[in-house]
Amino acid sequence: MEVVSKIDQENQAKIWKQIFGFAESLVLKCAVQLEIAETLHNNVKPMSLSELASKLPAQPVNEDRLYRILHFLVHMKLFNKDATTQKYSLAPPAKYLLKGWEKSMVPSILSVTDKDFTAPWNHLGDGLTGNCNAFEKALGKGIRVYMRENPEKDQLFNEGMACDTRLFASALVNECKSIFSDGINTLAGVGRGTGTAVKAISKAFPDIKCTIHDLPEVTSKNSKIPRDVFKSVPSADAIFMKSILHEWNDEECIQILKRCKEAIPKGGKVIIADVVIDMDSTHPYSKSRLAMDLAMMLHTGGKERTEEDWKKLIDAAGFASCKITKLSALQSVIEAYPH
């Protein structure tokens, strides 16, 4: 039998790691559902296995199973285990597993890992031969109909989006002040969700009059102004859209951008908050951005775009120029200027 070389061993290990890649997402979800981070945080001091087991909300707890879950979480570097005392504590990333603060990532974790929202991934390859709608194949209907018929899932999705937007908005208002200080008196936010980003902009720049114009499928619940962006966009010095264009194909995006161009005055601009895929695969967000691209392909038929893709799209919509600013967030800011 052939001896396994060191290189072969390393390559096999990489494949095994990818085979069980799903485990990290689901163990992370389990940690959130069990409130492990909350329990350790509330206790202040590190906790032994038995102490932690006795304080978790779910009771009674099987300590052996909890130990094995914690072992995996420690391996993920989300929690620490002291080699001497055998007690557990929070590692720095675990603060994002705590509920109830503005940078908590719990809603995003629960949304992205939801069993219905992950179901289309099982049909990833189906779309290569024909025009398969993976979401519809997995759940029996397209995503927009599904959301209307399943309000609890729609709420879960919107909470995840709002969570993502809070993280983005913090970076936006702190790192991109110049975007909002060049003659913008009015700003219209157009999108699907809770208006989290526009509210943050309004709070950070109170001199700008901000309005929220939501897509029809969510207006009824959020008491905002309904707007079909394919037909018209509200007039303002700046149009703001976050995570909207990635839901649509290039032709549909060009239509939306043309409506935006018609709505802004000379000296105005369109501010787009969306993923810009990295050509540098070493960027901390590069893998997440590529995964987002696949998620959009599966869920809506949309896509994430590279810097070059964005420039071509904006040029095709008739804009004169654009500027892309990278932030310390999953999304970047793309400013499109009509003149």
UniProtKB/Swiss-Prot annotation:
Catalytic activity: (S)-scoulerine + S-adenosyl-L-methionine = (S)-tetrahydrocolumbamine + S-adenosyl-L-homocysteine + H(+)
Binding site for substrate: 164, 243-247
Binding site for S-adenosyl-L-methionine: 161, 165, 191, 214, 228-229, 242
InterPro entries: COMT-like, O_MeTrfase_dom, Plant_O-MeTrfase_dimerisation, SAM-dependent_MTases_sf, WH-like_DNA-bd_sf, WH_DNA-bd_sf
A Gene Ontology biological process term: methylation
Tissue-by-tissue expression: Highly expressed in capsules. Expressed is stems. Expressed at low levels in roots.
GO molecular function annotation: (S)-scoulerine 9-O-methyltransferase activity; O-methyltransferase activity; protein dimerization activity
Gene3D superfamilies: Vaccinia Virus protein VP39 (3.40.50.150), Winged helix-like DNA-binding domain superfamily/Winged helix DNA-binding domain (1.10.10.10)
Alphabetical UniProt keywords: Alkaloid metabolism, Methyltransferase, S-adenosyl-L-methionine, Transferase
Active-site residues, record numbering mapped to chain: 246 (proton acceptor)
Entry's family note: Belongs to the class I-like SAM-binding methyltransferase superfamily. Cation-independent O-methyltransferase family. COMT subfamily.
PANTHER family documented for this protein: O-METHYLTRANSFERASE
Subunit note: Homodimer. Forms heterodimer with SOMT2. The heterodimer SOMT2-SOMT3 possesses 3-O-acetyl-4'-O-demethylpapaveroxine 4'-O-methyltransferase activity, where SOMT2 is the catalytic subunit.
UniProt function note: Methyltransferase involved in the biosynthesis of the benzylisoquinoline alkaloid noscapine. Catalyzes the conversion of (S)-scoulerine to (S)-tetrahydrocolumbamine.
Name by which UniProt lists this protein: Scoulerine-9-O-methyltransferase 3
Naturally occurring in which organism (per UniProt): Papaver somniferum (Opium poppy)
Protein encoded by which gene: SOMT3
